[in-house]
Amino acid sequence: MWYQRTITLSEKPRGFHLITDEITDKLSGLPPVETGLLHLLLLHTSASLTLNENCDPTVRADMERHFLKTVPDNAAYEHDYEGADDMPSHIKSSVLGVSLLLPVRQGRLQLGTWQGIWLGEHRIHGGPRKIIATLQGE
C-alpha cells in the first residue's frame, strides 16, 4: 500500500533543527504499516534534510558553524540575485541533500538511538518548508 501527504514545517531561523517529532506528528493518522519505507522529499533548493545527533543541541550549533565557515555568505558567487545567503544555501542543500529514505516497522520509524531528522535551514529568512512524505509498506 502507498500513502502520500504533503506536510508544511513551521518557519525556522537559519541553522539546523531537530524535526523528528514535527514530522511524526504531521504524519499521525496514516494507517499503520507493519514493514515499510518512508521517503521524505524537501521541496526547496535552499534547505536540506539529514540524519544526525538527536540529543545534544551543541552538535547542531557546531554543524552550523562548520557550514558557515566552509561555505561563507561573503564569497564571490555569480548567483547573488536573492542576497548573500542565496548561493551558499544552494551549495549546502546539494551537499547535504533534500531527501531521506527511512525504514518503518510496526508503525514506527526505525532510527538509531541517537539519530534524529534534521532540517538544515540555510537562508536567513527561509519561511515555511514543504515536504512530500511517501509511505510504502504492508
Swiss-Prot record:
Q: What species is this protein from? A: Salmonella typhimurium (strain LT2 / SGSC1412 / ATCC 700720)
Q: Which cysteine residues pair off into disulfide bonds? A: none
Report the family membership.
Answer: Belongs to the UPF0047 family.
Name of this chain's protein: UPF0047 protein YjbQ
One Pfam family assigned to this protein is UPF0047
